Every structure is written in structure tokens, then in C-alpha cells.
Amino acid sequence: MGKKKVHITSLGLLHFLVTSGRYAGRGGGGKGSDMRFTWLLFLALSNCFFCSIVSAKPAKAHCKNPYFWRCYGVPHTCPPGCPKFCQVDCKICKPYCACDKPGAVCQDPRFIGGDGIMFYFHGRKDKDFCLVTDAGIHINGHFIGKNNRKGRDFTWVQSIGVLFGRHRLFVGARKVSRWHAFDDNIHIQLDGADVEIPSGEGAVWESRGAGLTIERVAAENDVVVEVTGLVEIRARVVPITAEESRVHGYDIAEDDDCFAHLELSFKLSSPSPSLHGILGQTYAPDYRSRVKIGAAMPIMGGEKKFSSSHLFATDCAVSRFGTEGEEEGNELKTANVAKSQ
């Protein structure tokens, strides 16, 4: 909003000055009037130019791990592919776009598989789909969206439900009409109870009983969730901006619903060979991508087999959750058969 207001003010002033200049030229006024007009015109043009430059300036990021002392705290300019938000690889001390790394789920869901191949899975708005499923962990995503008169619905991941052990973790974006960057719009619950993370970048909330740690990567809307021995999830709440709506044709009204959603990045600690789900399957050792690699928008199908009845359901057709004992039993049977032979 700030940029738009400044441009309107600057251009309005410019229009006023040009109009005034025409009348001044007709009615005279002497050198003093001409000089004042020229000076004000210069200021108006400078103001427009300056605001355009400042608003386009990319964001900065830095390494936050003091172990990498050579890189720690060093500011880096975000790459052109993600000028508003990026992360720094502390090992090589270079910025990168988090949404371009394996394990990412961003935008109108755009996935980067464990094999490094990018694909889209659109699903359906107001429905839940299995993202990752394994014997010890199950992660569903709730999709929100908007009708598209030209074809499929536009969809985004509004929240995730993580099941591990006997626990249920909810991480979601609150519904907001007008986006304010300094409002914390991330909502987290563990087993139905709200999680109140202390304020401030670097603040940590921990549940030792659940083996769960949540850290604020930024003061608002950006956290890293770690389930010990299973998964690390980075979750960031972002809106659909007016520029994105214009470019992609989302047709989102400014004061209606900015469709706040999650940008996610998953790091799986010890995935089993039977790992499945929209994203999980791409980590399986025998997985072969079925998407059209050369397509402008490669689509992952299989909506029915990934569909779940609700956010914490494990009833999708490819569910693996809770099968740890079965897998161990099958391995034992195989071993006994081998010995008998």
C-alpha cells in the first residue's frame, strides 16, 4: 500500500504542476515563478523515480548459525528469483531460494521432489491431501483456493496436520483480509492446545515429552518445527499480493481475503523405502517421476489416492502410518525364510 500511495501523490503533484505551468506560461509571472515551477517539477520527478528504485530493492539475508563463524551475520542480497525472501547456505556462504530446494512446497502448490524434479499438484480447494506418509509420521495438507472461470481452481496449502506417535501438530495460516507484515498470522497447536511461542527472532518453544521443538526464524510468520528423529519443517506464512494476483490472474479483491497460506520446506530425517504421499513418494529409492519434464507446468496426478477425509486422517489410499510393527514383522519373516533355505 505504501508504494501505491506514494506514486499517486507524486503523479498527482506532477499533474498539478504541469497544469499550473501551462497557466503560468499563459499569464506570465516572471523569472521567479518560472524558477519555482522548474524546481518543484524537478522534485516531483525525483520523488517518483526515487520511490520506484527503493521499492524494487531486494531483501537481505544472513547466516544465523554461529558455528560457521566466517559466514555468520554476513548480509547477502537475495537472488533475482526470490528478491523478497531467501535463505543463506552457511556452509558455502551463499543465498538461495528456499522454494527451489528439494522438499519445498510453495505457491500454487509447486513441489520440488526429493529427486530434484519440480511439479505441480493442484488438488481441490477446501480439501485435504496426504503430503508425506511413513510408518512413524503422517503429514496432510489443507488446500484453500479460489474459483477460476477459465479452468481448474487456484489452490494453496493453508495448513498442515502432522501425526507422530500419539501426537497431533497443527501449523496453519490465519485467515486475514488485509495483510500487515508485522502481524503474526501463524497458528500452531499441539494435541488441540494452542502453542504460544515467545516473541522475537530466535525464540524457542519446546515439548520434551513430544520430542518437539519450534523456533522463530523471524519475529513474525516464520518458524522451524523439528520432530526429533523424524522431520524438520520450515513454515512461513505469506499472502497473495496484488502483483501476484495481477500477473497470474487470481482476481483477488484487496479487502476481501488475501489468501494467506504456507510456504513449506521439509527435511526428512530417516525415511523408509516405503515412504509415500505427494511429496514423500519422490524420496523412495525406486521412484521414477511420471510428470512431463519438458512441460511449462508439469502436473502430478493421482488426486484420489492422496485424498484424506480430514486434516488428521490417515485414510488416504497410500497411507503408511502405523505400519512400523508390520514392516518389522515382514522383515523378520523374510530373514527366517532365508535361514531355513
Model-derived regions: residue spans:
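N-terminal leader/presequence-like segments
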Residues: R22-R26, K31-M35, L43, S52-V54, ...
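Intrinsically disordered, low-complexity basic segments at termini and long loops, enriched
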Residues: M1-S33
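Secreted, short cysteine-rich peptides and small extracellular cysteine-rich domains stabilized by multiple disulfide
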Residues: K57-D100
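Von Willebrand factor type D
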Residues: D100-Q341
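A positional/structural detector of protein chain ends, strongest at the extreme C-terminus
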Residues: M1-K4, F37-T38, K339-Q341
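Cleavable N-terminal signal peptides of Sec/SRP-targeted secreted and luminal proteins
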Residues: I8-T19, R36-V54
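Intrinsically disordered, low-complexity N-terminal regions enriched in serine/proline/glycine
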Residues: L14, R22, S33, F49-F50, ...
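Low-complexity, Ser/Thr/Pro-rich intrinsically disordered segments found in N-terminal tails, propeptides
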Residues: F50-Y72, G113-D115, H122-G123, C130-T133
